[in-house]
From Swiss-Prot:
Catalytic activity: (2R)-3-phosphoglycerate + ATP = (2R)-3-phospho-glyceroyl phosphate + ADP
Cellular component GO terms held in the UniProt record: cytosol
Domain of life according to the entry: Bacteria
InterPro entries referenced in this protein's UniProt entry, alphabetically: Phosphoglycerate_kinase (IPR001576), Phosphoglycerate_kinase_CS (IPR015911), Phosphoglycerate_kinase_N (IPR015824), Phosphoglycerate_kinase_sf (IPR036043)
Record-listed ATP binding positions: K197, E322, G352, G353, D354, T355
GO BP field: gluconeogenesis; glycolytic process
Nucleotide-binding listed as a keyword: yes
The name this protein goes by in its record: Phosphoglycerate kinase
Source organism phylogeny: Bacteria, Pseudomonadati, Pseudomonadota, Alphaproteobacteria, Rhodobacterales
């Protein structure tokens, strides 16, 4: 796949309409996690260094085409200015005339694109309006690339377009992990439900050498083999799907790793009493028992598998990582992946949902090769889908 980057564009003296994702968590009017803001700073600095004027487009929350004051992007200004080290000009009601003669070195943030009813509908009229506000379009919001919206896709077809530095890094990392990986390649797919990751699992078993399944999802796979897992989180309606995925993995030569032991408790709370129980097709738990984490034998098997790999993709935790003592499997395996990455033995790419939080909690995130801040876009890429925001940049 080929796409243009800022290296391919002459932005000197031009207004660069820059789509970013600064949909950050806010409490009591304060940004509580600046990660997404920090990640767009290299693109802003690059545009400024090349003599361009960045005009940021972004969404915030889900106002559904209405002006909702508490979803104004104004709340992000202090964090943006602190990260960038310069003033950012906020414009609530932009128009072409107002943005036609901006002073050199100015950085502009426009109001929430989703206040406009045409944004999520990818309305051609809104796309044409946005195109009047800039000379070049730069998309740095991979995390919104799975949405065909006016500010991600529509405007990209109307202006010379390229990927920003964050988008470029995301695409390069994901292509290296899935499209052209160093083999053997494996993945960890965890989390609560099989139902949300069917397409992902179906796509991965055809591409991987090793697939580790963990979290509540693993319970459904074990139940599909005959295990009786008491009050454990599982999806009986998806047991047949689990069997199909296991058969597909076998046909494709993909080694499927399910837990062989589990941390079992009768209460889902911090510090709950627990025991380690062997897991397999003949396992029978009491009606009030729950599998809440993978056990030590499972952890050892996963870590041994990691040591055979050259590329690892990680999506989802191996247990109820939010609560001690059910975070042990996620923490131990994440730290092993981080160690292997740091030693140069492994390329590791992670993203989606709870994954970033789990790896941060484990203290492993800093040593992974790449961690994607994207949720849905990361998953859809891993499912093999074409992302509209990326497709619009090709050529």
């Amino acid at each position: 796949m080929s796409w243009k980057t800022l290296d391919d564009m002459d932005v000197a003296g031009k207004r660069v309409l820059l789509r970013v994702d600064i949909n950050v968590p806010v409490e009591e009017g304060q940004v509580t996690d600046r990660t997404r803001i920090d990640r767009i700073i290299p693109t802003l600095q690059d545009i400024l260094a090349k003599g361009g004027t960045p005009i940021m487009l972004a969404h915030f929350g889900r106002p559904k085409g209405k002006v909702v004051p508490e979803m104004s992007l104004r709340v992000t200004l202090p964090a943006l200015e602190a990260a960038l080290g310069r003033k950012v000009t906020f414009i609530e009601e932009p128009n072409a005339e107002r943005l036609s003669d901006l002073p050199e070195g100015i950085v502009v943030l426009l109001e929430n694109t989703r206040f406009a009813v045409g944004e999520e509908a990818n309305d051609p009229e809104m796309a044409r309006f946005l195109a009047t506000l800039g000379d070049v379009f730069c998309n740095d919001a991979f995390s919104a690339a799975h949405r065909a919206h006016a500010s991600t896709t529509g405007v990209a077809h109307l202006l010379p377009s390229c990927a920003g530095r964050l988008m470029q890094a995301e695409l390069s990392a994901l292509e290296a992990a899935l499209s052209t990986p160093q083999r053997p390649v494996g993945a960890v797919v965890g989390g609560a439900k099989v139902s949300t990751k069917i397409a992902l699992l179906e796509n991965l078993v055809a591409r991987l050498d090793v697939l580790v399944i963990g979290g509540g999802m693993a319970n459904t796979f074990l139940a599909a083999q005959g295990a009786k897992l008491g009050a454990s989180l599982m999806e009986p309606d998806y047991m047949e799907t689990a069997r199909t995925i296991m058969q597909s993995a076998e046909r494709a030569g993909c080694k499927l790793l399910l837990p062989v032991d589990g941390v079992v408790a009768r209460e889902f709370k911090a510090g709950a009493d627990f025991e380690v129980v062997a897991l397999g097709k003949d396992t029978v738990l009491a009606e009030d028992q729950m599998v809440l984490d993978a056990g030590p034998q499972s952890v050892a098997a996963v870590m041994a598998a990691f040591r055979t790999l050259k590329t690892l993709i990680w999506n989802g935790p191996l247990g109820a990582f939010e609560i001690t003592p059910f975070n042990q499997a996620t923490n131990a395996t994440a730290l092993e992946a981080a160690r292997l990455t740091k030693s140069g033995a492994l390329i590791s790419v992670a993203g989606g949902g709870d994954t970033v939080a789990a790896l941060n909690q484990a203290g492993a995130a800093a040593d992974f090769t790449y961690i994607s801040t994207a949720g849905g876009a990361f998953l859809e890429w891993m499912e093999g889908k074409t992302l509209p925001g990326v497709a619009a940049l090709q050529g």
